[in-house]
């Protein structure tokens, strides 16, 4: 009887393991951050638009909350909520990276990342085409022109409806490339759409690292409006010191 019972227990355990292996299991975590900026303008020419005020002191903030869900343990569904009071027009290079206005809570990013062989693949809306690019820069700021060590447009290219792939193909070496299509009515990869594509190659170890990036921003139907970006980032860590980038 003990042998029969043991056989039944073993059979039940095998069935439970089979159910767990094919079951839907999710884990969701939440993270967030708040960025703030205070600044004053001189009585010189306006940086953006026409403004006759001689002096301007402004305060801007931006906060975001990320929900990350994994269904298999190897994938990730990311949904990002964001809000802020900075004017949406003040996002030109050299000012700030804030894009929200009127304190409106918006869904800023939705993307899904999963493994495909040796590649990490990400697809999403309002997602950077450079999501899976290597990047050797340790500097991050809220000012666009200073972000990613001044190489933002190349190694941290933005995007709309995007796909991004990245892989580590050798010890310390990584490669990534991506494509972004226009989510508007112009279609994806058409003559009228404002698409983008890019690639980056990087190497890193415990002491130093570097990345070379390339991106092309298609100007759409506007003649001679395509823009090409090249960028490089690097870091070096002397023994016993923090990272210099």
Which residues are covered by each model-predicted region?
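Beta-barrel outer-membrane channel/assembly domains of diderm bacteria
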Residues: 1-130, 143, 147-184, 192-208, ...
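Long, hydrophobic, well-ordered secondary-structure blocks that form the structural core
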Residues: 138-141
